[in-house]
Amino acid sequence: MPIPFKPVLAAAAIAQAFPAFAADPAPQSAQTLNEITVTGTHKTQKLGEEKIRRKTLDKLLVNDEHDLVRYDPGISVVEGGRAGSNGFTIRGVDKDRVAINVDGLAQAESRSSEAFQELFGAYGNFNANRNTSEPENFSEVTITKGADSLKSGSGALGGAVNYQTKSASDYVSEDKPYHLGIKGGSVGKNSQKFSSITAAGRLFGLDALLVYTRRFGKETKNRSTEGDIEIKNDGYVYNPTDTGGPSKYLTYVATGVARSQPDPQEWVNKSTLFKLGYNFNDQNRIGWIFEDSRTDRFTNELSNLWTGTTTSAATGDYRHRQDVSYRRRSGVEYKNELEHGPWDSLKLRYDKQRIDMNTWTWDIPKNYDKRGINGEVYHSFRHIRQNTAQWTADFEKQLDFSKAVWAAQYGLGGGKGDNANSDYSYFAKLYDPKILASNQAKITMLIENRSKYKFAYWNNAFHLGGNDRFRLNAGIRYDKNSSSAKDDPKYTTAIRGQIPHLGSERAHAGFSYGTGFDWRFTKHLHLLAKYSTGFRAPTSDETWLLFPHPDFYLKANPNLKAEKAKNWELGLAGSGKAGNFKLSGFKTKYRDFIELTYMGVSSDDKNNPRYAPLSDGTALVSSPVWQNQNRSAAWVKGIEFNGTWNLDSIGLPKGLHTGLNVSYIKGKATQNNGKETPINALSPWTAVYSLGYDAPSKRWGINAYATRTAAKKPSDTVHSNDDLNNPWPYAKHSKAYTLFDLSAYLNIGKQVTLRAAAYNITNKQYYTWESLRSIREFGTVNRVDNKTHAGIQRFTSPGRSYNFTIEAKF
C-alpha cells in the first residue's frame, strides 16, 4: 500500500522542518486547556481537538455542515437523502455515535438503528435525520475526535461537534455600544440565496443580540454525464401505438430508480437567535436566550421506485414530499464571579428545547387527468417530536502556587426528555384536499417514551515547572441515563404484553475518564499524550421499537447495555513565527455495539426469549424473530497531521503561507465468533494541501486548495451485518479523485468585505464514499437498479460551482 503513506511521509518531513524555522511566539494572555482557562505564556495545541472561530467560518464561506468540514479530512457528513444530512462520521462511527451539542444542549437523536431502517427508513415516510443548525448563529465550533464523554456526555463515542452561539459581548463593549452586520450571498451547488442580519447593543448594563437569517434554494446539483437510462424487459422498447401494456414494456426513464438527475426540490429556512442580558455589576449577570429555526423541503420524488414507469397505462403514483425540521429553544442563565470563595466563576443555566422532524407525503395518481374531479390523493403524515429540559451548574476555580497552577472545573446537571410521535393517513379529493374520501387512520408507528438523565464532573489542569514545562489534565464524570416506555390507555392487554417493562425505568450508569499530558521539552516543541473514554446510551428506537408481524417479528429490548469506547493518542506539536504543526497517532477501541440480530424462529412458549405474540394475543410459531442486541466490538487506528508554514520565514513575501492536513485511518470490527471484518463507516485517506496569500495591508487575500482522496476499496467494505463475506456492491464506483478550489476576499474600507470561491474548478465527476454508502438495496428511496446500477450517477457530487458573499459591519 505505497500510495496512502505518501501524505504521511510528507507530513513527517514537514514536522522535521518546522523546528528549524521556529521562533519565539508572541506572548499569550490566557491559555485554554480542556476548556479550563489558566494563566500561561505560550499556545498549546490539543490532541484530537480543533476550534473553528467566527473569523474562519466567514473565511471558509461556511453555509452548512459540508462547508464546515470541507478541509478537515478526519470528519465527514453522513448523507441523509432528500431531507439533508444525518450527523457526522468520526473515526469509524457515525450518526448518534458522534455527539452534537449547541451551548451544551444535546441535539436530536436520529432514527438510524438497523431495525428502524429495515422497517421504515427505506421507504422515506419519516424524516429520520438529526437536525442541523444555522451557521450564522455561531461564534465558535469545536470538533473533538476520539471518545470524549467527559466533556460531551452520551453519544461521544467517536467524537463530538460542539457549537457555541454568538453573544452580544462578541460585538459590543463600553467603547463600542452598538453593532450592525448585514450579510448576503449565493451558493452555486444548490442555487441558494441567503441574507443575514446581526445586531447588538449595550446600554446601562443591558445588552442584546439579534441574529436573523433566511435561506432558500433548490436541490443540490450533481455531475451526471449521461441521460436517463432506459431499462427494458425482454429486449422490448416501448411503442406508444402498441397495446402490449406495461407488464410487457416495463421501462424506467426520467423517473424511477434509474434516474440520473437529482429529484426537483425547493427549500426555505428561517432562523432567529435572540439574547438579552443584564449586568447588575462586574460580578453578577443574568441572561435570556431564544432560538427558533425551521427548514421546509418540498420534493417531487421522481426517483421513487413506484414512480418508475413511462408506459401509457399508469402503474404508479407521483409522490410529493414535504420534510420539516423545526427547533425551538429558550433558556435563562446566571453568572457570578468571586475574587475569594469556592469558585472564581459560576454559571447556572436552564434550557428547554423542542425538535420536530416531520414528513408529509402525497401520492398523486398518474391518471388523475382521466379521473377528473373524482380523482383522489393519498396523504400520510409522520411526526417525531423530541422535547428536552436541562439544567446545569458549572464552576471554575484556579489556585496559584510558586511553581505550579491548579485549575479546576467542576459541576453537575440533569434533565428530562420526552419522545412523542403522531402518525395518520387518509384519502382526499385531489382538487379539494379538504374533502376526505376515507376515514383518517391514526396509528402509532413508534413506541413513545420518557427519559431522565443526571451527571456530575470534575476536571483538573495542573501546570508544573517553570515556563509551563509540564501540563497534566485529569478528569472524571458520572452519568446516569434512564428511559421508560409510555403507557397509553388505548393499548390492549395484548399490546401491553408486547412491551417489556412497560412504564418502568431502564437505566444506564457509569463513569467517563480523561487524562492528558503536555511536555514542553524544547522552546518550541511539545510531546502530547491523551487517554479518554466515551459511552452512548441506547436511543429510544433501539430500546423500544417493536414490530409484531409474521414475516418480520421485531422484539423490543430494554435490557441493552450502553456502547463504550476507549481512546489513546500520542503526538508531537510545535509552534513559532514560522508556523505550527501537530502530528499524532491514535487508537480507539469500541465494544458492545448495538446491532439488529436474528434470534431464530418464534415459539409459543412464554418463557422462551423468542416468544412472539401478535396484537390480538395470538402467539406465532416458526416466524423469524429479530431484536437489537449488544454484539460486536471494533478497533480503529490512524495518523493525522496538520500544519501551517509561513513562507516569509524563508525569505518569500510576507503573508505567503502553505498548509497540509492529512488523515489516514484503518480498522476492523470483531464479531462474536472472533472474526474481524471491515468497517463501512471508515473514510478513505484524504490529504488537503493549501497555498495562500494575505496582503500585509489586510485588504485582500487569496487561497488555493487541493484535496486528494483515495478510493474506498471493495475489500475494505462489507455487504451487511447479515452478509459479512461480500463487499458493499456500490463500492466499485469509488475512485480516487483530486479537487481544486480557490477562494478570495477583498476588504473595502473598514466596513465592507467581499468573499468569493470556486469549487471543483476542473469540473471533476466523483463520488464521495458517504454518498455511495447511502444507497439502498431495498425499499423505494435512494435506490439504483440493483443489477445494472443504472441511476448511479444521481449520486455524483456537484461539479464546478461558485459561492459569493458580501458583508457590511457598522
UniProtKB/Swiss-Prot annotation:
Its main location: membrane. Coiled coil: none annotated. It is found in: Cell outer membrane. Residues 175-810 form the TBDR beta-barrel domain. The keyword Chaperone does not apply. GO terms for cellular component: cell outer membrane. Keywords: Cell outer membrane, Membrane, Receptor, Signal, TonB box, Transmembrane, Transmembrane beta strand, Transport. GO terms for molecular function: siderophore uptake transmembrane transporter activity. A motif (TonB C-terminal box) lies at residues 793-810. Residues 34-166 form the TBDR plug domain. Residues 1-22 form the signal peptide. It comes from the Bacteria. It is a multi-pass membrane protein. NCBIfam families: TonB-hemlactrns. Belongs to the TonB-dependent receptor family. Acts as a receptor for hemoglobin or the hemoglobin/haptoglobin complex and is required for heme uptake. This is Hemoglobin-haptoglobin utilization protein B. It comes from Neisseria meningitidis serogroup A / serotype 4A (strain DSM 15465 / Z2491). The gene is hpuB.
